[in-house]
Amino acid sequence: MNRGYSESAMVMYVAADGETALTLRFCRFPDDGVTWLWCHVLDGDRLFGFTDHDLPCDGARAFDGPAAAYATVAPTALIERSGSDGAMTEARFSAGLLMAERAAGRHGPGDTRVSVNGVFTPRYSLGEAVAEGRREVVGALVGEIVLGGRRLRLEGLAKYHEQRQDTPRFIEPFRYLCLWGPTASCVAIASRAGQIGAAMLDGAESVVTRFVAPPIADARSVELGLRDGIGLRADVRTLKAISLPIGSETWRGSFVTATLGGHAVTGMLNEWQADRLPPPAS
């Protein structure tokens, strides 16, 4: 497990009809010389994935620059942010990977050649005061997936996430929900330190102070409490679950569709040792 400074970037897309989804994620550990690369593609009910936790990384730190590039050479993959962290203008991404068709993860290549590319254009940053060193941006994505010779068009709302931290990753339990749609979005994080996040409904943003979710299931009703005392419910349905080994434990994620306070949204719900989270305060 890598324990030094780290910085990550991630592009997430789930089509409004739930038929196509993509996530491309880098996590750089420049002090350790290691890059993690994750990529998952959903095509109907088929999930393809590639992960590797042992790719090289140079010693430069990307997050604070006037632009940032997260990249690997073999295999070839890239997320390139234009503009600084607080003033990004776009993020371009691409990857050419040999993926495996499976939901239960193991690291390394598969036997299906997949390429992805596209451009993410930001619309607004969600919850800028939520947590130091992390950026959650909702925007528009245009791109394509080429899977087994078939071209899948990507066009619609998406999410960009970038984060840096000095403390080790995947030590403390957490639950992470991110949802987005034309009229609503949210990000909510539960950890031992408490629950934080932000929700945007019809153009008005509120701070999330409570985040409660039942155990992993195909359908879950998630409770969000807002700072102004209003309760907000997200009814979440899993499109496809994903699991990955990290050390001796298992990270669990999922592409989802949902309603957020009655608004149609899509997104992801990811968990790490969630059964070890303390119950939220009443």
Region spans (language model):
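Structured soluble/peripheral alpha/beta segments that form catalytic or ligand/cofactor-binding pockets
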Residues: 1-282
